[in-house]
Design a protein with these regions (language model features):
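C-terminal appended segment following the main domain
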Residues: 252-303
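Conserved alpha-helical "signature site"
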Residues: 1-192, 196-269
Length: 303
């Protein structure tokens, strides 16, 4: 069975929501009309973050230019320095220079850090959502997508962005309509994927994949990312492209990590075409997959 799209909406585990027996909120809004009427304020990514993301796409960018842009945002600067001084990058001496930190981390890793921090910061608090859990699961999906992309044939950065942002539509709905979110979700357990999208459609008049795709388009991320997220709760077709296969697989692995599945159980939830890229003897996962999954289990938040 293929694991569907999995935004990590985590509540107290009292009972599991089932769309067919969950009462609908008496007021169903029209999200698109509310945007047109100025009643919905979509999250905005800080200008400095947008500038950094654009600059970091240039493989020949001057690291001093990046350092100068970073210095405009003390929070991001602190995160970059903390990462540069972490055990992952050696951590043998205290590094206080942002230029040196940028050189050490590298532009690709820095771009992902800036994107993750900028996106998470743009949402602030969301009533009823366990944001640390949400962003940790999103980061695991993003990391999984990044690692899967080369074998599946997807563009690496598009895969990472898709994994990171795939559940943001749910945050937007809950932040925009907190009364409906409270009515529908309070007191219920984890709700994921197509099940969550069905409940959202019934109560909000739209689901998180469509909201997330709309937001991604407004902030100027690549169209393939928006299209892939828009289709993420639909049944996976035989003609699914590399980016869609990568996102579905990444979400399956993020859900497996949340359930504390063993590697073999996580592997069994991948689409067959992706399993074939990592298959060992007898249909079991190979050493590369086991190493990938172990790394996902050890993922620490950097937001």
């Amino acid at each position: 069975m293929i694991e569907p799209h999995t935004p990590a909406y985590t509540l107290e585990p009292t009972k599991r929501v089932v769309a067919n027996d969950q009462p609908s909120h008496p007021r169903t809004p029209n999200f698109i009309n509310d945007i047109a009427a100025g009643k919905v304020e979509l999250p905005t990514i800080p200008r400095v973050v947008q500038q950094l993301i654009t600059a970091l796409r240039d493989p020949d960018v001057d690291t001093r230019k990046i350092g100068a842009a970073l210095s405009q945002d003390p929070v991001l600067t602190a995160k970059v320095l903390r990462l540069a001084n972490s055990a992952f990058f050696g951590g043998q001496r205290s590094m206080a220079s942002i230029d040196a930190a940028v050189s050490l981390i590298g532009t690709q890793a820095l771009g992902r850090l800036v994107l993750a921090g900028g996106v998470a910061g743009s949402f602030g608090t969301v009533p009823g959502i366990d944001l640390p859990t949400f962003w940790r699961d999103s980061l695991i999906a993003a990391t999984a997508a990044q690692k899967l992309a080369p074998r599946v044939g997807a563009e690496v950065e598009e895969a990472y962005v898709s994994g990171l942002l795939h559940g943001t539509g749910h945050l937007i709905l809950c932040k925009t309509y907190p009364d409906i979110a409270d009515f529908v979700f309070t007191g219920y357990a984890v709700v994921r994927g197509a099940e969550l999208a069905t409940i959202e459609q019934e109560n909000f008049g739209i689901d998180h994949p469509n909201v997330g795709a709309l937001w991604i388009e407004t902030i100027g991320f690549p169209q393939p990312v928006a299209d892939t997220i828009r289709n993420a709760a639909q049944p996976l077709s035989g003609s699914a492209g590399p980016l869609e296969l990568t996102l579905r697989s990444a979400c399956a692995l993020a859900a497996a990590v949340a359930r504390k599945d063993e590697a073999a159980a996580a592997f069994a939830r991948l689409p067959p075409v992706v399993q074939a890229r990592y298959g060992g003897a007898g249909g079991a996962p190979d050493a590369a997959f086991e190493k990938l999954y172990e790394a996902l289990q050890e993922t620490e938040p950097t937001m």
